[in-house]
């Protein structure tokens, strides 16, 4: 459970302190794109959609949900892997668009064993995949979301050599073009080490990270996107001490949030939420 034209200043946070409209540089006619607010108070609501806590100015929800009123909403799309509820659909109708191993069976994400890896290895397959992804991207736009979180850019690292970063960046460019045509900002998710290429070649507008502080990757994003980096840390993986330690660190993004791993709602006893 990993989704433009005027170039953003990537040398520091101050130049990106407020959202601004952009125009796309692709051949597709584009609507105005509004960037997420920075810094922001982020809530990450993929497991359940609920009224955001007081003070929240930015929320991410799944593409099947509706935006929270009155704040900036980012729409989650699993851009490079399949969703669990579509398991049979992909196996029965789209199997040729899945990466398969030497045994002919689709390769799965070992951490998310109900997700197949999409085959981005050829231009023809990327075009077909983008047409399928367009359903979710269009739904995000129609429901009023302002941004996209495209998950699993790093799927090539789980493809057993069948995919490369070049394949995924080329596919991401198709998603970026569609997002901007609909007026949606689009964020890089995963593959911190290729952030420079992702920004320059794809045209991602911001970065959405999970546990970049825990894995010491935040700088890879912020060096490219400045203040336009949002990070979610999790309660079960705080190797450097309590969340207050994260918040005191100059290495964290300005927009940093703590959540429980399953992202449950506040009516669940496992719910945890905090922010810097």
List the model feature ranges, each with a label:
Residues 1-20:
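Secretory targeting and sorting signals
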Residues 22-276:
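Glycan-processing catalytic domains of CAZymes
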């Amino acid at each position: 459970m990993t989704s433009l034209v005027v170039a953003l200043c990537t040398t520091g946070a101050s130049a990106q302190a407020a959202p601004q409209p952009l125009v796309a540089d692709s051949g597709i006619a584009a609507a105005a794109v509004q960037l997420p607010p920075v810094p922001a108070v982020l809530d990450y609501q993929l497991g359940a959609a609920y009224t955001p806590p007081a003070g929240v100015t930015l929320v991410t929800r799944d593409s099947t949900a509706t935006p929270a009123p009155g704040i900036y909403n980012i729409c989650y799309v699993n851009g490079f892997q399949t969703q669990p509820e579509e398991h049979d659909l992909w196996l029965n109708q789209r199997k040729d668009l899945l990466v398969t191993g030497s045994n002919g069976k689709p390769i799965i994400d070992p951490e998310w064993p109900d997700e197949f890896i999409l085959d981005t290895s050829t231009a023809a397959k990327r075009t077909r995949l983008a047409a399928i992804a367009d359903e979710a991207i269009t739904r995000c736009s129609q429901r009023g979301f302002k941004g996209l979180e495209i998950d699993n850019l790093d799927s090539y690292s789980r493809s057993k050599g069948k995919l490369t970063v070049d394949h995924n960046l080329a596919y991401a460019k198709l998603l970026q073009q569609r997002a901007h045509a609909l007026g949606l900002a689009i964020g890089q998710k995963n593959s911190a080490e290729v952030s420079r290429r992702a920004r320059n070649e794809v045209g991602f507008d911001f970065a959405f990270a999970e546990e970049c502080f825990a894995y010491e990757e935040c700088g890879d994003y912020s060096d490219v996107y400045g203040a336009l980096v949002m990070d979610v840390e999790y309660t079960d993986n705080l190797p450097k001490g309590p969340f207050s330690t994260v918040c005191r660190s100059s290495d964290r993004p300005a927009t940093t949030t703590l959540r429980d791993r399953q992202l449950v709602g506040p009516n669940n006893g496992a719910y945890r939420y905090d922010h810097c």
